[in-house]
Every structure is written in structure tokens, then in C-alpha cells.
């Protein structure tokens, strides 16, 4: 993944102590690099005729967390949510911050049912988190959208389905997993 990403002038690094991948973008290769790790996983799935799922997770009402409790609390929430996803993920899964309060998971060798089960475990783990702040207790929920690779897909196609299902999860009231 790192080698393929460097070809697009992007670097993916694992954050120390968190197990979470972060993206550092260089001018010029942003669009191609954004989907690079999904595309590498898709290429492997095509070669092996295996399964692949991409899950997008979004912290519900995150703007109001920042507005009400402050950006320090928002940072704490984001780190704790990311940590909960990393703990729930398998060692072979890629968990990356996708942007803002969105996280992306690439689950190689995982079909829709398995991805939905994992996302549900993650949703419950996030819902169980509690934060003590200067302005009182805080808890958050997370919405998940699951996209599954289908023969002939590319990385952006799988990601687009995950994004569409994340939007459906938000539209259906948040704090849920939508996989189909």
C-alpha cells in the first residue's frame, strides 16, 4: 500500500500508539491518492476472487460537540472513537481518518454480512464511550455505511456505495449501520 501510494505522491503513516492510519497529502496527487489504498485492496480482491468491504463511519452531530463542549473535547472524542474502531478491527483491517469526523475502514476478505456485523460492534463500542468535560458528561453515536466490492468495481465505486449508505444511515435517524 505504501509503495503504491508513494507513486501518487501521498504518504500513509500509522499514527504512533493508535493503530490509525493518517493521510498526508502532497500538492498534485490528492484525488488519485485519496482512493489508493482502496484500489490496492480492490486489485487484490480481483486477483484472488475474494471479498472486500469498505465502511465509512461518521460521528453523529460532531459539529455540536465542538460548538457546545469546545474543540479540545471534539479532539478527545475523535481520538476515542478512532481508538474504539481500531480496537474492534482485526489486525488485517485498515482504519483511516477520511476527513473531518469521518473514518474509513477497508476490510479485505470480508463480505457484506461480516462487514455489517463488525460495523455494528463498532457502533455499540462508540455508543458505550463516556466523556467528562468542563461542561458536563458527553456521549456520542456513530453512523456507518457499508460498501461491498462487486466484480468490475474500482476503489471509488466501492467507496461511493459506502458513502451512499452512510447518507442513508443519517437520513434514517443516525446511530445505525446501513449495509444494503
Predicted regions and their residues:
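Catalytic-core segments of nucleotide cyclases and related cyclic-nucleotide turnover enzymes
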Residues: 112, 116-119, 148-179
Amino acid at each position: 500500500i505504501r509503495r503504491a501510494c508513494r507513486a501518487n505522491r501521498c504518504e500513509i503513516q500509522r499514527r504512533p500508539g493508535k493503530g490509525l492510519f493518517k493521510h498526508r497529502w502532497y500538492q498534485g496527487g490528492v484525488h488519485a491518492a485519496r482512493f489508493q489504498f482502496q484500489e490496492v485492496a480492490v486489485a487484490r480482491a480481483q486477483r484472488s476472487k475474494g471479498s472486500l468491504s469498505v465502511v465509512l463511519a461518521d460521528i453523529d452531530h460532531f459539529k455540536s460537540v465542538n460548538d457546545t463542549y469546545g474543540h479540545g473535547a471534539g479532539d478527545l472524542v475523535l481520538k476515542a472513537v478512532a481508538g474504539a474502531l481500531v480496537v474492534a478491527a482485526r489486525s488485517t483491517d485498515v482504519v483511516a481518518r477520511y476527513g473531518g469526523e469521518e473514518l474509513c475502514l477497508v476490510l479485505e476478505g470480508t463480505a457484506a454480512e461480516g462487514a455489517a456485523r463488525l460495523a455494528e460492534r463498532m457502533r455499540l463500542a462508540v455508543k458505550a464511550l463516556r466523556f467528562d468535560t468542563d461542561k458536563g458528561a458527553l456521549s456520542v453515536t456513530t453512523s456507518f455505511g457499508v460498501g461491498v466490492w462487486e466484480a468490475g468495481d474500482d476503489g471509488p465505486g466501492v467507496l461511493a456505495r459506502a458513502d451512499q449508505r452512510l447518507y442513508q444511515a443519517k437520513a434514517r435517524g443516525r446511530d445505525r449501520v446501513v449495509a444494503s
